[in-house]
């Protein structure tokens, strides 16, 4: 008789159970496991450790093989806490990489890095699983069409428009509005485009995971009454979990998004919040695996790890994946290796300014620092391009004049410069926009502004049609 133990998508038969190793060393979340001669697990295979701790509580830890050490030993990284594990405990090689449930049944649910639900709504009823390590699509499969992805957010659509099927980075320090902007984008895209989103929370704090979840339920992006009508699947690797979980939760989210693209042939929006914590988790794991650190203490494989994860997030002829990634900028330094490495892969960058946030202008997007490969007249059209350039030129001149204004005052400027300053301030205030997901805090109903309306509004400010109106108007 062959007995089977169900674990996620794996059914570990007695035949596989014969490939059992044992723990020889535990260093925090990193484990060394000895296996039988000739039966060493492959790189990225998942190992399952079951047993009891000293208090008699059941333990169930999944690890991923990272290094083959020789002498029939491998080094693995745990995906959950290793508290209670002891040397000599058995470790079962599943014979395959970690696989997670995919498909419509994941919508409206919160899963961890292993694909297990953590929202107390019962198991995810999915018969389909995908391994989290998958190859990027071949070049011949890629979709090379260029089209704008309208977000309904004025300053984004005008200054640095997003490409459908592109990769977008939201750059900003702490507290400038990255998470709110991501949640607003999920809301707008679900309602205006009818697409599905996958939100990958990498190293999330409680607030960062809980607040968007509650806001999505309020805005019906997650439908509690009929969960199957939800438009987003959430995957969280929490901050209190080992670095292995944060390092792989992005791969789990990408895998779920790839199913909607490749099988359902849908347009998908994976949101990664934050990509920096993926880098930090990789740095921790790299140090624990004994690799020499590189610049600023980051892992020497930073470029390779970033490239392998980013290349999977792409559009094919079957469907598009438009990825939006929040990039925390340490100490507001854009030259730090983490944001610098990330920006090399992006089609558009939306930079959030602390100065604008301090003025109460939200979303605090800086049109001068934000860039997009779509900002070309032959892609967006002459009218859009000229308007965006006019906004940037006016904002740049205002920025140049700020030191003079601070020292000598506004009255010392020429008439032309005073007009420029007045128009730049109107542009700043016109760029702000009430958010759907922040209605409960601001008391102002959210607004979705189409691209033609956005262009028309800025075109009225630039030549001075609205010079007679006060800034507050």
From Swiss-Prot:
Gene Ontology molecular function: any one: proton-transporting ATP synthase activity, rotational mechanism
**What Pfam families does UniProt report for this protein, alphabetically?**
ATP-synt_ab, ATP-synt_ab_N, ATP-synt_VA_C
Main localization of the protein described in the UniProt heading: plastid
Keyword Transmembrane present in the record's keywords: the answer is no
Tell me how this protein sits in the membrane. Peripheral membrane protein
Query: Which NCBIfam families does this UniProt record tie to the protein?
Result: atpD (TIGR01039)
PANTHER family, sorted: ATP SYNTHASE, ATP SYNTHASE SUBUNIT BETA, MITOCHONDRIAL
Q: What is this protein called?
A: ATP synthase subunit beta, chloroplastic
């Amino acid at each position: 008789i062959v007995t089977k133990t169900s674990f996620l998508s794996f059914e570990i038969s007695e035949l596989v159970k014969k490939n059992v190793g044992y723990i020889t060393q535990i260093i925090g979340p990193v484990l060394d496991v000895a296996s039988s001669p000739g039966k060493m697990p492959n790189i990225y295979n998942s190992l399952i450790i079951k047993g009891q701790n000293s208090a008699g509580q059941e333990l169930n830890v999944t690890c991923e093989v990272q290094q083959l050490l020789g002498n029939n030993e491998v080094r693995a990284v745990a995906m959950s806490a290793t508290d209670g594990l002891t040397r000599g405990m058995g470790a079962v090689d599943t014979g395959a990489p970690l696989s997670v449930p995919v498909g419509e049944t994941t919508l409206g649910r919160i899963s961890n890095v292993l694909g297990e639900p953590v929202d107390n709504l019962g198991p995810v009823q999915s018969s389909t699983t995908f391994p989290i390590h998958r190859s990027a699509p071949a070049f011949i499969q890629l979709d090379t069409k260029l089209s704008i992805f309208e977000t309904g957010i004025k300053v984004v659509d005008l200054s640095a428009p997003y490409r459908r099927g592109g990769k977008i980075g939201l750059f900003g320090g702490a507290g400038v509005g990255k998470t709110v902007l991501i949640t607003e984008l999920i809301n707008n895209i679900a309602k205006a485009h009818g697409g599905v989103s996958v939100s990958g929370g990498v190293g999330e704090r409680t607030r960062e995971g809980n607040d968007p979840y509650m806001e999505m339920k309020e805005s019906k992006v997650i439908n509690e009454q009929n969960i199957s009508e939800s438009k987003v699947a959430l995957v969280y690797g929490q901050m209190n979990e080992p670095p292995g979980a944060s390092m792989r939760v992005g791969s789990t989210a990408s895998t779920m998004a790839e199913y909607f693209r490749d099988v359902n042939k849908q347009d998908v929006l994976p949101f990664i919040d934050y990509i920096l914590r993926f880098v930090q988790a990789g740095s921790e794991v790299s140090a624990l695996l004994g690799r020499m650190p590189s610049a600023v203490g980051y892992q020497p494989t930073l470029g390779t790890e970033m490239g392998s994860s980013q290349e999977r997030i792409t559009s094919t002829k079957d469907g598009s994946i438009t990825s939006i990634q929040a990039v925390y900028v340490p100490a507001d330094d854009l030259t730090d290796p983490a944001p610098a490495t990330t920006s090399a892969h992006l089609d558009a960058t939306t930079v959030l300014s602390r100065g604008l946030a301090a003025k109460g202008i939200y979303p605090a997007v800086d049109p001068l620092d934000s860039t997009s490969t779509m900002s070309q007249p032959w892609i967006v059209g002459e009218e859009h391009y000229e308007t965006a350039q006019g906004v940037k030129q006016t904002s740049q001149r205002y920025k140049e004049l700020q030191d003079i204004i601070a020292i000598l005052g506004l009255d010392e400027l020429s008439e032309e410069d005073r007009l420029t300053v007045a128009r730049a301030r109107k542009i700043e205030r016109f760029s702000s926009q009430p958010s759907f997901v922040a209605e409960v805090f601001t008391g102002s109903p959210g607004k979705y502004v189409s691209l033609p309306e956005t262009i028309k509004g800025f075109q009225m400010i630039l030549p001075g049609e609205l010079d007679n109106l006060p800034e507050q108007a």
